[in-house]
């Protein structure tokens, strides 16, 4: 049996960070791929959403080459599934920057607010009622130019409860007179 991704998926994604500057910030989740999960929960297949096709077809934006309207779903799936470590962080940054550019018409699928107080030294934001899929999770307005480390992440949500960490540091404002 196959469980198709729909509103009934009702997944929860909890994003955490140890950086106190994230406290109280808004965090957005942008669905890049929808997901179909096997009945036993062991296999997940992803389908690229129409809104993200232009991102992958633009090699400068995504880093993926050779994507056309006909093959973009398969090429994007293959590309993203192989990303790890620093390459994954760099890709999440590019995707976040693309999503936050209003001209690209990528709407946040969900928005959450990071807790004002730390629990176990972590500040958390929880997204509830998510469809299964692959999400770009980022703090709006933060770009690689004004952060150190990771401020965006790419998360697979293919089960009821998923957790992820954002390991970057938001900048402090240094006012010089």
Stretch-by-stretch model annotation:
Residues 1-177:
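Solvent-exposed loop/turn and edge beta-strand elements of beta-rich ligand-binding domains
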């Amino acid at each position: 049996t196959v469980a198709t991704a729909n509103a009934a998926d009702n997944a929860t994604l909890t994003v955490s960070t140890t950086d106190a500057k994230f406290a109280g910030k808004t965090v957005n989740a942008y669905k890049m791929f929808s997901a179909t999960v096997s009945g036993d929960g062991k296999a997940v297949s992803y389908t690229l959403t129409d809104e993200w096709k232009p991102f992958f077809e633009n090699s400068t934006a995504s880093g993926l080459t050779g994507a056309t309207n006909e093959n973009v779903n398969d090429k994007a799936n293959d590309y993203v599934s192989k990303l790890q470590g620093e390459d994954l962080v760099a890709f999440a940054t590019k995707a976040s920057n693309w999503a936050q550019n209003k001209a690209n018409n990528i709407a946040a699928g969900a928005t959450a607010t990071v807790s004002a107080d730390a629990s176990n030294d972590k500040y958390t934001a929880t997204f509830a009622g998510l469809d299964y899929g692959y999400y770009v999770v980022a703090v709006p307005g933060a770009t690689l130019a004004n952060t150190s480390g990771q401020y965006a992440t790419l998360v697979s949500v293919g089960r009821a409860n998923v957790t992820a960490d954002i390991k970057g540091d938001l900048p402090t404002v240094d006012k010089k007179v």
